[in-house]
Amino acid sequence: MNMDINTKKRFTEYLTELHRLNKKHGFTIDNAEVFDKGSFSGYIEVTRESMSIVLDDIVTLEIETDSID
């Protein structure tokens, strides 16, 4: 996977905030958000139990509901 540390950090921050809002407000995203950012592609999936980001078919971040306040 060809992704620099700043890109990984931005995705981590985005997903952490998205998951915090999901836990606080109880919304769910039924369909994964698919994205293509040049050198990599993947999707974001949010459920009530966890949130994960998959880049180039590799799970790069997975957060369980209880790990975010």
Q: Where do the language-model regions lie?
A:
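Detector for the mature cores of small, proteolytically processed
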Residues: 30-69
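N-terminal acidic leader/helix
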Residues: 2-31, 62
